[in-house]
Curated annotation (Swiss-Prot):
Homotetramer. Its EC number is 2.7.4.6. Its cofactor is Mg(2+). It comes from Granulibacter bethesdensis (strain ATCC BAA-1260 / CGDNIH1). This is Nucleoside diphosphate kinase.
Amino acid sequence: MAIERTFSIIKPDATRRNLTGRINAVFEENGLRIVAQKRVQLSQAQAEAFYGVHRERPFFNDLVSFMISGPVVVQVLEGENAVARNRELMGATDPKKADAGTIRAQFAESIEANSVHGSDSAENAAIEIAYFFAGSEIVA
């Protein structure tokens, strides 16, 4: 199995409810190491650029508004097959469809306020990590 890195965001709905530690515990208890982490308040420009792939989708403006509504925690997670493992731990985007025990089943409020974002591929993980972190900020 390959050791890889993935990118994660703990979203405003979760930071607002002080769930960062509980979500971090899920990652760590399931074989993912947090090798970089910082709490940030996204600007509208940052959120629009980060989610630019969704610009033409009907939910884009609501997504950006939500992501700037409060602080987020951006993270680099490392472990065996980290991208796939993180996606398993997060659960389905819609918390009503998420398997019991997943982060979204436990903590999400709605399909929009679903507590976490995770990279969908190793390629996108590299892009997303570079968007928020300099190489020197990642400490394995």
